[in-house]
A protein has these predicted regions:
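Short S/T/G/P-rich N-terminal loop/turn motif that feeds into the first structured element of a domain
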Residues: 1-46, 50-59, 66-76, 92-109
Length: 109
């Protein structure tokens, strides 16, 4: 992950991806690999994988990117394509993907 310099402006692009699993065990393996590898991509500030406590078999990836261009580059990357292809047959429907811009963001130095 890129460690921001103290003088860096905080300009975050946040992506959420929600997945409803048909095969939770196999899906978690795909998503965990994606998260670990994506954290090393240029412009990545953080990526977390969460499991819902209110909706069984629902998983959420939360990504924070240094800029909109870093996020776009990642979405066009081989790692993103590989993850999407690996999810084939593991979901009950398409993932819900949302893109946010940081309204109030703070990075700890």
């Amino acid at each position: 992950m890129h460690e921001p310099e103290p003088a860096d402006d905080v300009e975050l692009t946040v992506v959420t991806m929600a997945f409803d699993a048909a095969d939770p065990e196999r899906l978690l393996a795909v998503l965990a690999k994606y998260v670990v590898l994506s954290r090393m991509q240029p412009g990545c500030r953080n990526i977390d994988l969460c499991g819902s406590v209110t909706t069984d078999r629902r998983y959420l990836i939360i990504e924070k990117w240094q800029s909109p261009s870093a996020q776009r580059a990642h979405f066009d990357s081989p790692g993103m394509v590989e993850m999407a292809e690996a999810c084939n047959g593991l979901l009950t429907g398409p993932p819900r993907i949302e893109l946010f811009e940081g309204v109030s963001a703070h990075d700890l130095a």
